[in-house]
């Protein structure tokens, strides 16, 4: 059996608010541990660059412009991307038949892939691949090829693979209109069910699941000009080559060709399902223009509210978010935890580093009681941990937080921004691991932040002072001595700093008051100092009016 989740619905409902970003504050993590103000500054043509035109009913026209067929190896897509970058970018227009061009969300949702048509189902493999139809938001024609024995073959569109509503079923095209994406199923949670494992659909977006997870945040191939006042550029995966997996392996490999006005690229994803599903990513980029505002290993998520910042919400649910914090382990091995926020204005923070060990958007709150949502089950959303391979050099982890009033809007973006621009006409190779799961980054000895809450410091009378409460979880035995707390701010006044044992979680609770005075933005930092050598997370937070 195949258990079909709501991946299509979630992709469709998650409207991309990044297209209309407004001006916001940008800050940079400086050597003193605080953020300082920074200024917000501002593909080759395919083999056949003609638009695909619908053919007459009954006539089949295979569309192969990017997805090279025939002999295939690990450098095939790299060679295609290199050739693509030498020519001007061509914005392809692949009009859908009128019966599909303007369908509604409900009509698109009714177009369902038939599980019995899944690729490799008849082969008895542990993986089965399904395809997504074009339509609604997903208008781009995506080419897909299957690789077996070093040979790639084109996977043509077949209307018989889909069911649709009564009217639409009669009007599904017979010509090769391609697909809008793919998803792969695997018996992740039970030997008798093929659960969704990962999805590639929409621009360069993709997502995956660890054991027991439900879809939440997404990753992207590349981010360009995120939070730029002139608008963001969204590269697209034009074509995929999916290698047929072996019978006795837990590995499946997907190759992808990335294209945009600014860059072309070749990606190789080696995917291993498990408690934490791991993707080994190899990316080769060929900039057409200088890329000064580029984001590597970008993740996109949603944060609406939590116990830290509920004053602007009227919701029966205590928390609503796909991720609740940004975790970083910098090049010096320091663990940094930055709770997410739903700010009043666009906020962009940059945390300077040299050769980061890892970073990612985490969902740490795993108790249903803290969400109370019987449908969304935010407690099951995966975290995503990025592990760079090799020395990525100087740069910054950049966090973008966008105001939102609805959970259907992704409003959180995190990625690595190199310090030096990527030069036009050059070739860049980056490798990294993406780990999806409930605890993709777990240190058995670390003292970690488990919860951040804030509220008015004096409940008896109005006051600008804010009370912050931070809970720390101790992994393993507690230290023999109580840590020494230190709380700092680059503006305003910190007072009443108290650290006490928290028997409820075998950890500690740190509380303090913050008086912003006349400022509208401040960077807060809390540290616990131990007498013994043990990793302890440093808590960072941006307070805004």
Swiss-Prot record:
Cellular localisation: Periplasm
Coiled coil stretches, renumbered: none
Function text: Involved in the biosynthesis of osmoregulated periplasmic glucans (OPGs).
The protein's annotated pathway: Glycan metabolism; osmoregulated periplasmic glucan (OPG) biosynthesis
GO terms, biological process: beta-glucan biosynthetic process
Molecular-function GO term, any one: carbohydrate binding
Residues annotated as signal peptide: 1-35
Transmembrane segments: none
Top-level taxonomic group: Bacteria
Entry's family note: Belongs to the OpgD/OpgG family.
Keywords associated with the record: Periplasm, Signal
GO cellular component: outer membrane-bounded periplasmic space
Protein name: Glucans biosynthesis protein G
Gene name of the encoded protein: opgG
